[in-house]
Amino acid sequence: MFNKLNKINKIKNCFNKSIYQINYSSKPIFKEGITNVKLDRDNKDGTSDYIKLHDNVIMNTYGRVSDIVFTHGKDSWLYDMKGDKYLDFGAGIAVNALGHSNDGWSEVVANQSKKLTHLSNLYYNQPAIELAQSMIASTPIFDKVFFANSGTEANEAALKFAKKIGIAKGGVDKHEIIAFSHGFSGRSMGSLSCTHKSKYREIYGPLVPGVHFAEYNDIESVKKLMSKSKTCAVIIEPVQGEGGLEAATVEFMQQLYKLCKENDCLLIVDEVQCGIGRTGQLWAHTRFDTEKCKPDIMTLAKPLAGGLPIGAVLVSDKVASEIKPGDHGTTFGGGPLVCEVGKYVFERISQPSFLKEVQEKGKYLTDGLKKLKDQFPNSILEIRTVGGLFVGIQLDHNVSDLVSYAKSQKILIINAGDDVIRFCPPLTITKQEIDQLLLVLKNYLIKVNSNKK
């Protein structure tokens, strides 16, 4: 008994010593060369310090196209640590629809952040309900909304809904998806399975089975893959963003809708990048005539909250009636802060006068590009647009040099493949700012063509 008590006391003493040996007032031990690096946000010569630290603490998953560290933005302009300003024709890849630090947007963020930012979906919140009301009121096709946090999540939810309905109605074999060449649906496992580019897919196999790729705008290739007993959904971008701004034709989409209807499968339109005013229409799919092409599901994200993370899935009653509590969910989706901001952005963009301006500025940009094509027909091979401020130009060479040249002239543009430049500026961009872009493009083309002589 005495020995047992002695052992217990020894253990207690060791435990107590280990506690009291900790000096809680001392500074934590940090990794050398990481957290002891002194950074100064106001130092105009501090760009390299931030980039060096970035390389040490942030995973290398992005090929950064520049050595710029941005500090703030206003409207169509971004400002870096050195004090230089850049005209932004990428808008965060079609996200900042109202530009950077829009006054009304900033006011809504500030006001809502003082009230309620996050709640969870165990409870109701006013902004989510009001945003859903605005969105559903704007379309005759869709009846319910599911909120997510990104385009990938929106597409993932859409695919899950389609699979559940397909299996419930057609048995375990009716789970297959048809996607399209050059399409981009996202990077999570389900949406990645519907993304065509092999460099995104091949290192993560095996992916979700039963996904087949048809040729974009080729209805015969879809027919070869379609099966009434196996296909549960077709997912398609009305305008492909990553795929070089190729647009689906009206005839193809109407035939696709008819084919889906005949085979009892759902039609999903992915408007993550091309929706909410980007094409000059509120919804990109309305170009196909909603009487002859009536999608069952539409996914949205990028511009909806003007820079805050949000995604949305709009569905018909036919779909909504099959989805029950527990079939899908999200912790952050539909939060009061992002939905209040989304409500402001959506109601602003959906105004007819706003959309008319987008159409006019899109035409102004396209007309300017056509003039350049007339001047340099061997350099600009094609101009791609269905309207609005979502315009691509295909060049006869790799566009990386143009991206670098434009950056040197303080204009930011982004590619959509090796030979296509994608222009998706803030929808609030001015014609004077478009002129600045056109001048830089002209100077670049003069330079390229003089080097060919």
Swiss-Prot record:
**Which SUPFAM superfamilies does the UniProt entry name for this protein?**
PLP-dependent transferases
This protein's record includes keyword Nuclease: no
Q: What is its EC number?
A: 2.6.1.11
Q: Which domain of life is it from?
A: Eukaryota
Name where it's found.
Mitochondrion matrix
Task: Identify residues that carry N6-(pyridoxal phosphate)lysine.
Answer: 302
What UniProt keywords apply to this chain's record, in alphabetical order?
Amino-acid biosynthesis, Aminotransferase, Arginine biosynthesis, Mitochondrion, Pyridoxal phosphate, Transferase, Transit peptide
Query: What is the uppermost EC class here?
Result: transferase
Enumerate the cofactors the protein uses.
Answer: pyridoxal 5'-phosphate
Main localization, broad class: mitochondrion
Coiled coil feature spans: none
Q: Does the keyword Repeat apply?
A: no
Q: What CDD domains does this protein map onto?
A: OAT_like
Instruction: Name the HAMAP family for this protein.
Output: ArgD_aminotrans_3
Q: Which NCBIfam families match?
A: argD, PRK01278.1
> What protein family does this chain belong to?
Belongs to the class-III pyridoxal-phosphate-dependent aminotransferase family.
Task: Write down what this protein is called.
Answer: Probable acetylornithine aminotransferase, mitochondrial
Origin species: Dictyostelium discoideum
**Lineage per the UniProt record:** Eukaryota, Amoebozoa, Evosea, Eumycetozoa, Dictyostelia
